[in-house]
């Protein structure tokens, strides 16, 4: 049996695009519009299974009540003058004819204009684009509509960079997307072994977690910092660098012009590629409504924007590995870009997500506004050694005795302070229900012996402890220094981490510690009298450092530090860190 698909566009006749269901799938290359997997109907247990269900070729006719049907029948028999008496149009000028809405709808539904020949399809209409929102696999439907998923390697494939690049033509433009939440963890230096820096385009997304507006000094300072970092470290030209936000749809019109045609969007899993592509697509779709504001705001256009965001472009999800295959996205018939599955080098990435529901995963990745939570003006908590700072039970910072720190939280995770590491270890055997609100995994939290154990390299001044895809914790030592013992960090194996210089120093102006005449000021007067300056990246010192892997059997932490850097310097209990040598034991 033949099925008809009736589509109506503004000022265009209705089109019959397809005659059979198989023709639909052939034109769409048999791919899920949400994740890109090849669709199949044979095996429910294999990836890509889908059911047609209620689709565009099975749309139910609009329900019209019996009373309205009778009304329309009588109304259609009246002449225009009698019909005008039945409706409230006394304030309408006499020369403007008014047609009852109910009658108009019924006539259109009763006698649609149908073109029966395939060759009558407009040449500027891309069939794949029209079908973009029609067919999704069972996995994607369950995720989006039921919040139901099983995190495994079969349904959520996450490969390494080399394997992902092997699926992309060598001469195709690459757009590398990375997140502002965990910069620079999202940039894999191996990409420069495959492509020349001048042939790569870089986009920092999720910048709404760093500053609140898409324009202004913070945006400009951030762009300057990225130009310095990528330019001096990797020789990327500044015209190949862009910053924006897919979630807030910042600068998407400029982004549309920035990306080359037929480019492939690559990046770490969960970095925001699909959301960014979707935002570009939505911005172009909204051009069809010239009288409507395209800004996402708390106004009347929200429903239009949100509906467009739900119905066009690739699917988006907080789940890592959601996109499963390369997916073409057609934008306005003028540009084609490809959404590519994310990559990672962390083989344990899925472990934590197997134990979480979709709402909790969204909370894990949400982040918070650093401009509000992680500057010198922000609220902080004070932790004294040997206290342990819990990062909602997925990480534990153990501080040395006789030390004190101010902690500012730029994640969405809850912080909680415990007496010492012994107390934490005993709790993890059986987490009390009263502590469930501050333990992400609650009763499924592993014992401390199953966490990865690190030493934080020696640091001087403020540092950011960065958690991949999650955000960062700002750590500031305060008080007199009495020990060279190191901070220890216990972290769930599904998460990677680094420390870095405070990123806010590069997108905010900071204190010089001097007055307007250049005279040094005591710290108590900095807030009131100090001048400001903007830090610039020079590539002379490390911007970040890996943490030092360790085990419980390792006793001498000084030996571990020296073995980690192997630069001839010896860290010990007497070593004095200053502003001149503070990066001696950092390793990128």
UniProtKB/Swiss-Prot annotation:
The GO terms describing molecular function are: GTP binding
Phylogenetic lineage: Eukaryota, Fungi, Dikarya, Ascomycota, Saccharomycotina
What is known about what this protein does? Answer: May be involved in the mitochondrial lipid metabolism.
Q: Which family does it belong to?
A: Belongs to the TRAFAC class YlqF/YawG GTPase family. GEP3 subfamily.
- Native organism is Candida tropicalis (strain ATCC MYA-3404 / T1) (Yeast)
Q: Which InterPro entries match?
A: G_CP_dom, Mito_lipid_metab_GTPase, P-loop_NTPase
The record's PANTHER family line, in alphabetical order, gives:
GENETIC INTERACTOR OF PROHIBITINS 3, MITOCHONDRIAL
List where in the cell it is found.
Mitochondrion
- UniProt gene name: GEP3
Protein name per the record: Genetic interactor of prohibitins 3, mitochondrial
């Amino acid at each position: 049996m033949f099925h008809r698909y009736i589509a109506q566009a503004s000022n265009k006749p209705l089109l019959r695009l397809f005659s059979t269901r198989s023709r639909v799938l052939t034109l769409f290359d048999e791919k899920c519009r949400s994740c890109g997997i090849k669709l199949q109907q044979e095996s429910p247990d294999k990836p890509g299974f889908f059911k047609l269900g209620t689709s565009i070729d099975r749309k139910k006719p609009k329900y019209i009540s019996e009373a309205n049907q009778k009304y329309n029948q009588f109304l259609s028999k009246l002449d225009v003058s009698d019909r005008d008496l039945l409706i409230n149009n006394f304030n309408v000028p006499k020369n403007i004819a008014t047609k009852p809405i109910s009658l108009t709808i019924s006539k259109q539904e009763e006698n649609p204009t149908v073109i029966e020949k395939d060759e009558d399809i407009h040449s500027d209409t891309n069939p794949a684009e029209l079908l973009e929102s029609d067919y999704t696999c069972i996995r994607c439907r369950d995720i989006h509509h039921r919040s139901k998923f099983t995190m495994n390697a079969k349904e959520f494939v996450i490969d390494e960079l080399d394997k992902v690049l092997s699926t992309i033509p060598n001469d195709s433009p690459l757009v590398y997307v990375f997140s502002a939440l965990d910069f620079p963890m999202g940039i894999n230096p191996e990409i420069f072994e495959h492509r020349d820096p001048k042939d790569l385009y870089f986009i920092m997304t999720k910048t709404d977690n760093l500053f609140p507006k898409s324009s202004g000094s913070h945006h400009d300072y951030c762009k300057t910092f990225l130009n310095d970092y990528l330019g001096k470290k990797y020789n990327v030209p500044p015209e190949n660098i862009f910053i924006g936000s897919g979630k807030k749809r910042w600068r998407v019109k400029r982004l549309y012009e920035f990306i080359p045609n037929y480019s492939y969007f690559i990046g770490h899993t969960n970095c925001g590629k699909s959301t960014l592509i979707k935002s570009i697509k939505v911005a172009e779709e909204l051009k069809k409504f010239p009288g409507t504001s395209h800004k996402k705001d708390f106004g009347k256009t929200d429903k239009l924007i949100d509906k467009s965001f739900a119905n066009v472009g690739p699917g988006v999800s907080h789940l890592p590995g959601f996109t499963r295959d390369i997916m073409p996205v057609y934008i306005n018939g003028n540009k084609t870009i490809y959404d590519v599955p994310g990559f990672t080098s962390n083989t344990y990435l899925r472990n934590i997500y197997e134990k979480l529901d979709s709402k909790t995963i969204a909370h894990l990745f949400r982040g918070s506004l650093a401009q509000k939570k992680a500057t010198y003006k922000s609220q902080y908590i004070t932790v004294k050694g040997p206290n342990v700072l819990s990062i909602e039970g997925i990480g534990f910072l153990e501080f040395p005795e006789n030390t004190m720190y101010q902690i500012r939280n730029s994640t969405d995770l809850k912080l909680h302070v415990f007496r010492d590491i012994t107390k934490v270890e005993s709790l993890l055997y059986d987490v009390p229900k009263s502590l469930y609100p501050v333990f992400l995994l609650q009763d499924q939290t592993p014992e401390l012996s199953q966490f990865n154990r690190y030493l934080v390299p020696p640091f001087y001044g403020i540092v950011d402890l960065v958690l991949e895809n999650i955000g960062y914790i700002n750590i500031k030592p305060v008080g007199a220094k009495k020990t060279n013992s190191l901070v220890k960090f216990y972290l769930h194996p599904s998460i990677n981490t680094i420390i870095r210089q405070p990123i806010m120093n590069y997108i905010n102006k900071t204190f010089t510690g001097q007055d307007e005449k250049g005279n040094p000021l005591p710290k108590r007067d900095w807030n009131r009298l100090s001048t400001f300056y903007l830090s610039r990246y020079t590539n002379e010192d490390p911007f970040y450092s890996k943490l030092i892997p360790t085990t419980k059997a390792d006793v001498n932490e000084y030996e571990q530090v020296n073995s980690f850097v192997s630069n001839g310097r010896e860290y010990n209990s007497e070593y004095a860190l200053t502003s001149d040598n503070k990066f001696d034991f950092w390793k990128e």
